[in-house]
Amino acid sequence: MVPPLSAVRGTMEDMTIAEAPPRLAAAADVSLRWYPDGPYSLSRTLGPLLRGNSDPSFCVQGDVIWNAFTTPDGPATIRLASAGGGAAGTPLVDIQAWGPGADAAVKAAPRLLGADDDWQGFDEPAFHSTLPRMVQEARRRALAVRLPASGRMVDQLVPIILEQKVTVIEARRGYRYLVHRYGTPAPRAGMSTPAGLVVAPTAAQWLQVPSWEWHKAGVGPQRSATVMRALRSAVALERLAALPALVAGEKMQVIPGIGAWTAAEVVQRTHGCPDSISVGDYHLAAYVGAALTGRRTDDAGMLKLLEPWRGHRQRVVRMIQSTGFRKPTFGPRMTIQDHRGH
């Protein structure tokens, strides 16, 4: 559920976008200007929502990010332009949208941009002093990062299911194939619409994908069956966006094939959950252990390490990741499997 605009942190105003090409600004169906209440990075905030640099539903052009998606009112194309053009150079984001879902897209945009993400408790001196030095330093350098909340359950769940127990490369390759094959062209924003921008399939469209197309995409029967099971309850699934993140994650796991890892990955993106941890991730536990103690660990060890910061554990992980830290590598890498010719 999208909160009333007046209830969202930061400030907003209807606007005509001076920084955008005049014909583009004039042609927008709905537009808005949002002022974050502090430092802000559009690319670092929305980065976790992209399924790689070739995500068919996104296009990044410098300080501008385009995104095409489905709303309850229909498809929309949204253009998000980051600038420092507010009073005294304060950051702002210019928001424009086109298509039947333009109004819904703009109303949801502040939450998408992280307007509801409150770091006050994390930054409170007594709490901050308990954090490892690398996390403290990372936070100092990443004050502009927010946790985004897309509110779009199906759009996040499908690609995350495809990433279960396979490499990111093969999962994203399959996702791109299916979105291009079964998605729809993004609503046009005049001559400026990025070429090839696609709205990912709706739940109904995903349910029409035949078994041989999943196979051609390199998606095995276990993962495709999980997608189909989940999307047969798409209406109930979308309602989870209105629930608290941890409750939504628990309810999601009632669906066979959706476990703790999938649920955590989803609510991190749909709800901007500051605490959910991707237990069961192939790399995360070893990565966190190496970063915090110099030694690899397992899921139980990772949870024990992060327990002092419960309520903000995902923030801690994001800060570690923002440092560029790399754990020492030992043993074989996970092999990309290609079963499309079998």
Regions found by a protein language model. Give the residues of each.
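HhH-family (HhH-GPD) DNA N-glycosylase catalytic core used in base-excision repair
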Residues: 2-342
